[in-house]
């Protein structure tokens, strides 16, 4: 959010200095090469992963995809747009050539608008997915009637509409301007940068609201919902016997990992409270045990990933906004200069690793993803459909939408 120079400019009118020195810009060659390699890797992996995720969802549209497909498509499009627009512009104008800004005033405003739009769309989609998952796990009966694909589509559309509105101010406060003037008082063309156009006070208010709405509140909501989901999963497993009798209506602890098992547990619990008796036998399913363990780990990993990737980015924005002009010493400039590139790299990493989270959350999506990879790699295996009565999906598949029973799809 600063300038096309990756640190606050210190323009000097001394004509005896080089333009680098007058604008306060100096990026070492080793840093340019290093961050170019990192950006190229992130761009390649992230663009391929998000494009393939969107491909999987669209191909599976009439088959196995459930509610998760809308969230996956939303996140994939946001990540793909951010990487395709953000990384090339940043490499050219923020890493290699800090000035002059060559994309014009509209390009400056559009770049920051798209950047902010994708950030909002990502966090709102993650929060919406966490809310659906929490409801599906904690209130499965209600979730069956409420969490339809049609309503999920409206939820995703609403999140993008909100993102458009929240990102629009960025196109107003950013713009192109010249940092230096010639001896005749005319703007110096070579000093053209993409930077903030509003006062420091207005910028402080904007950044505070932006950090709160685009990071703190969505992350807090996601952490809370995922915490409730994890607690409910663990509580259910502690309440249910680990074994069940053949022919008995008593669900085993392992059977809770499917939606059918979760619903039967509710019926069984009511019967048991009214005096029903159960007898137990040994029952094992190692794969489902591991599925539950993985589901709990993934819920926690989602929050941790966004904290690691986004917290430094927003901390750096606050630093730019609140450090007074007279406090920018040379060591602080140098720190900010490279901190800028590190935080933006982490920000783009979050878009690149998002497809990995899809694969970790849903075993059904993972199978579709691997089939698509195999097909694109030349094995030409078609994306096969599962039979009408597949193996019971894991609870995380049910909660996220893949593996929905046919009657719940609309």
Swiss-Prot record:
Q: What is its main location?
A: membrane
Which GO molecular function, any one, fits this protein according to its record? G protein-coupled neurotensin receptor activity
Record keywords, A-Z: Cell membrane, Disulfide bond, G-protein coupled receptor, Lipoprotein, Membrane, Palmitate, Receptor, Transducer, Transmembrane, Transmembrane helix
Which residues pair up as cystines? 108-194
Lipidation feature positions (S-palmitoyl cysteine):
377
Spell out the GO cellular component terms annotated for this protein, sorted alphabetically and separated by semicolons. plasma membrane
- List all membrane-crossing ranges: 33-55, 65-87, 110-131, 155-176, 218-237, 298-318, 338-358
Q: Name one process (GO BP) from the record.
A: sensory perception
Q: In which tissues is it expressed?
A: Expressed in prostate (at protein level).
Query: For side Extracellular, which residue ranges?
Result: 1-32, 88-109, 177-217, 319-337
Q: Which residues lie on this side of the membrane: Cytoplasmic?
A: 56-64, 132-154, 238-297, 359-410
For membrane topology, the record states:
Multi-pass membrane protein
Q: Where does the record say this protein resides? A: Cell membrane
Q: What are the start and end residues of every segment in region (Disordered)?
A: 381-410
Q: Name one Pfam family in it.
A: 7tm_1
Q: Which family does it belong to?
A: Belongs to the G-protein coupled receptor 1 family. Neurotensin receptor subfamily. NTSR2 sub-subfamily.
Purpose of the protein: Receptor for the tridecapeptide neurotensin. It is associated with G proteins that activate a phosphatidylinositol-calcium second messenger system.
Name the record gives this protein? Neurotensin receptor type 2
């Amino acid at each position: 959010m600063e300038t096309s120079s990756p640190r606050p400019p210190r323009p000097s009118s001394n004509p005896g200095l080089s333009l680098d020195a007058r604008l306060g810009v100096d990026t070492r060659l080793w840093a340019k090469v290093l961050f170019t390699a990192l950006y190229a890797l992130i761009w390649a992996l992230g663009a391929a992963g998000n494009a393939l995720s969107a491909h999987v969802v669209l191909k599976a549209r009439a088959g196995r995809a459930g509610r998760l497909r809308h969230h996956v498509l939303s996140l994939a499009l946001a990540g793909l747009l951010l990487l395709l627009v953000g990384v090339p512009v940043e490499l050219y104008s923020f890493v290699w050539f800090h000035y002059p800004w060559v994309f014009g005033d509209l390009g400056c405003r559009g770049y920051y608008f798209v950047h902010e739009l994708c950030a909002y769309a990502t966090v709102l989609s993650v929060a919406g997915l966490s809310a659906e998952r929490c409801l599906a796990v904690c209130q499965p009966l209600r979730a069956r009637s409420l969490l339809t694909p049609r309503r999920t589509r409206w939820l995703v559309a609403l999140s993008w509409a909100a993102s458009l509105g929240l990102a629009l101010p960025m196109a107003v406060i950013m713009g192109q301007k010249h940092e230096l003037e010639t001896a005749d008082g005319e703007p110096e063309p070579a000093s053209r940068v993409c930077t903030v156009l509003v006062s420091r006070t207005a910028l402080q208010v904007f950044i505070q609201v932006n950090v709160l709405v685009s990071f703190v509140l969505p992350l807090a909501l996601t952490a809370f919902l995922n915490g409730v989901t994890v607690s409910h999963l663990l509580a259910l497993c502690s309440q249910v016997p680990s074994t069940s009798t053949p022919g008995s209506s008593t669900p085993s602890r392992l059977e809770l990992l499917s939606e059918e098992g979760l619903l039967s547990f509710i019926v069984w619990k009511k019967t048991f409270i009214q005096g029903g008796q159960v007898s137990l036998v040994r029952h094992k399913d190692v794969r489902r045990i591991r599925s539950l363990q993985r589901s709990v780990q993934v819920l926690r990993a989602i929050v941790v990933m966004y904290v690691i990737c986004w917290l430094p980015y927003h901390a750096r924005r606050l630093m730019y906004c609140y450090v007074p002009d007279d406090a920018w010493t040379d060591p602080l400039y140098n720190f900010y200069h490279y901190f800028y590139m590190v935080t933006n790299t982490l920000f783009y990493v979050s878009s690149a690793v998002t497809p990995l989270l899809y694969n970790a959350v849903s075993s059904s999506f993972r199978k579709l993803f691997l089939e698509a990879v195999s097909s694109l790699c030349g094995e030409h295996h078609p994306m096969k459909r599962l039979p009408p009565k597949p193996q019971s999906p894991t609870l995380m598949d049910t909660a996220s939408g893949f593996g929905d029973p046919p009657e719940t799809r609309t």
